[in-house]
Design a protein with these regions (language model features):
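Hydrophobic alpha-helical transmembrane segments in multi-pass integral membrane proteins
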Residues: 37, 103-106, 153-169, 216-228
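Multi-pass membrane catalytic core of lipid/isoprenoid biosynthesis enzymes
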Residues: 23-39, 52-118, 198-222
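C-terminal ends of transmembrane helices
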Residues: 68-83, 127-140, 186-194
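Hydrophobic core segments of alpha-helical transmembrane domains in multi-pass membrane proteins
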Residues: 54-62, 117-127, 168-180
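Short, Lys/Arg-rich, polar N-terminal cytosolic tail immediately upstream
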Residues: 1-23
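Short, hydrophobic transmembrane alpha-helix segments
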Residues: 41-54, 228
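Functional transmembrane core segments of multi-pass inner-membrane proteins
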Residues: 47, 147-191
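Intramembrane alpha-helical segments
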Residues: 89-162
Length: 228
């Protein structure tokens, strides 16, 4: 007899993503959407500097993609342990914390290079990456907190560092994408096969695919518009 099939509690617990906890922890389907929205913000800023954009992506990769997600896996051990029973929680947590610190280090470098005001984004981003996954304070691990930590702040930071100023366009974009990532998060919640019916989870996965396709397409087109 084969191993029992576990119900999917996350939309990316499929295929190669569920083969290894370190690989799953990067949460690529969601992380690439985040990078797409960060790209949209950078390319719509009054100025566009490729080196600043690449540094922004590097800081986000360390802090939010590796750091926050690895910490989240260890903080949610009861949720993920059935899928990765041999995972080394201590090693994953340590890697997550170190990655957040690495992301903050890149952010500090950017601050001294371009604008000391960017340190505000670095400090807040580090705080969100470290404490959102462990649900402290409680208000942070809510839909508004998610929108702030994974949408509004990264988008506004990406917009600001390009021209070192914030205008109404940048603020409006950050608010819009902050709400958009909450919609994405709720669709991901609705894919939990332990909590919802097959029709519900199927439709939620379809909407997530459409959402990802839109994010990738918009981000790529706007990036090309700045590079060509």
């Amino acid at each position: 007899m084969g191993e029992p099939v576990l119900p999917k509690v996350e939309p990316d617990l499929v295929g190669i993503w569920k083969k290894n906890v370190w690989w799953f922890g990067l949460r690529w389907p969601f992380s690439t959407v985040l990078f797409s929205w960060v790209t949209v913000a950078a390319t719509l800023a009054p100025e566009f500097h490729i080196y600043r954009y690449l540094l922004t992506m590097l800081a986000g990769f360390f802090g939010l993609v590796i750091g926050a997600h690895y910490i989240d896996i260890t903080a949610s051990k009861d949720k993920y342990l059935p899928y990765f029973p041999k995972m080394n929680r201590g090693a994953i947590r340590a890697a997550g914390v170190l990655a957040v610190l690495a992301g903050m280090a890149v952010g500090v470098y950017m601050s001294f290079l371009y604008s000391l005001w960017f340190l505000v984004f670095v400090i807040l981003g580090g705080f969100f990456a470290l404490f959102y996954p462990i649900e402290k304070p409680k208000w942070l691990h809510t839909y508004p907190g998610f929108g702030l930590a994974w949408g509004f702040m990264p988008v506004l930071a990406s917009y600001y560092i390009q021209a070192t100023r914030i205008d109404l366009l940048g603020l409006g974009l950050a608010v819009f994408l902050g709400i958009t990532v909450v919609e994405m998060h709720h669709m991901a919640v609705l894919t939990n096969e332990k909590e919802y019916s097959g029709d519900m989870t199927k439709n939620a996965r379809l909407l997530l695919k459409i959402h990802r396709a839109a994010a990738y397409t918009i981000g790529l087109i706007l990036l090309l518009s700045r590079l060509i």
